Amino acid sequence: TEAGAKRALKLPMSVPAHCKLMKPASEKFKEVLNSINMQEPKCKVIQNVNASATNKVETIAENLISQIYRPVRWTDIMNSLNELSLSKCFECGPGKVLSGLMKRTLKDTEIISLDNYESFTNKDNFL
């Protein structure tokens, strides 16, 4: 194609995530997020808004709000993860689609999908 894509896939989606149509939802989410006392994570978090690693709570919160209506920077995220030479990488959220995609790119990294309560409480995932 003109944009250089090799192939395009239709992904089933229940909401118009990561686009401007979700801006009103992000405002409501901001209200909820502001009522939560977030603690600084013990590891760095890479979010889809800017593809950079941080453990600053304020930045993580701002990015969580923005990622509802802003595009995912998948290639940038994969490049950032590759540069970190990680032994383990976690996908947080429902489903395992992204974990599958990550395994193709991060071949030397163990990819763990944290998509339910059991996966979050299984200590073996974090050793």
Task: Identify the residue ranges that each predicted region occupies.
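Acyl-group transfer acyltransferase/transacylase scaffold of fatty acid/polyketide systems
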Residues: 1-127
